[in-house]
Each structure stands twice: as C-alpha cells, then as structure tokens.
Amino acid sequence: MQNDTQNIIGVDVGSGSVRAGVFNLRGQLLAHATREITLFRSAGNKVEQSSREIWQAVCYCIKTAVANAGVSPSSIAGIGFDATCSLVVIGDNDAPLAVGIVLRDLP
C-alpha cells in the first residue's frame, strides 16, 4: 500500500454514470472506478434518476478507486466533486424527498 504522500479524489456525476479517480499531488492518476446509473423515462419526455442510486454509485466509486490505487484512506487530502446532471432535494432525515430531476428533462 502506498502511504508516502497525500492524494486527492475527483468525482464526476454525469447523466449516465458516476466516475471517481484517485490522483497524487502531481496530478498523476493512480486508479479510477465507474458505475452506470439508471435513467428512468416516463410520459411527457420526463427523465429522472434515483437519488439513492446516485449516492450509492458515488460511494462505490470512491471506495473502489481508493482500494485499486493501493493508498490508505487516511492519505486522502481532499475531494473535488462535479455534478451537472441532476437536482437532489433531501429532507430532515437526509433521505431524498423525490427522484432526481435530470438535465435532459428540461425543454
């Protein structure tokens, strides 16, 4: 296991998948992981996603990328996060109040 330096994680949530990569501080990719997320299509051209599935995919990709990089979780100095595809509204108990609204759903 590499533990001689700090590392960073980049996460990208797209409309079809979640991706996470572990990088050293020189910007070198050490490992990455991807997980597809389901698009639900309904009448009226509505396109939605499960907020819970998105979060589960984020957690899976981060854990998998860190494990595949062979670095200690304690070596992670920061996380960059990008999500341009959806809106998630959560309630008081941190549970999603509705499905995610996807950019493709807009006219």
PLM features per residue range, with description:
Residues 1-99:
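N-terminal glycine/serine-rich phosphate-binding loop of ATP-dependent small-molecule kinases
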Residues 104-107:
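Glycine-rich phosphate-binding loop plus the immediately following alpha-helix
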